[in-house]
Amino acid sequence: MAGSELIVFKEMREKGVDVVVTGTSTAAHAVVEAGGNIPVVTFGINDPLRTGLVASFAHPGGQVTGMSNFAGDLVPKRIELFKAAVPAISKIALARCPECGRQSGLSKSSIDAAFENYSENARSLGLTLIPLDIDAATDFPAAAALVKREQADGVLLMPTQINAKLRDDWVAFETAQRVPVMGDYRGYGCLLSFGPDPAERAPSG
């Protein structure tokens, strides 16, 4: 967990903050790790059970409650839609952030198992999936070079904070290299998108 996040949430605890509302698993974990019992309300995070934020859906326990978008579960459907929209596609680079997964409480084995699950789905459609690890914005040039070197004919963006920050870079890459990119949110401006609208799932009022 990033030290800066822990410091922020420890300061919140000391100032008597009543509740924390967040849209990321990383922040939710930071609140829990900072100690205390500040309630955490989440919206649009990935599977809270798999990342260890709750004990079960029926009886979550602890201090975390809210909504999940199960974004990882949508990846197989995204692969299927990508193939339907671009029939000639044969090799997809999956832009993921293993470090984001670790900060959200996932073990390396869980991250690897998730990729293998996606790969299996891709193989059933006659596709090859290439892991494209982007843990920081500075990793983008190397990732873009890998897409070209591996001759991937499509890029699938996992719903990570890093890919959200790099959305303009991905659109520019897509235009310059003529390689279709699929995101999880249409606001990114990629050729394709499939996923929940963050504006619709965010709290209002």
Regions found by a protein language model. Name each.
Residues 1-205:
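Short hydrophobic alpha-helices and adjacent helix-cap/hinge residues
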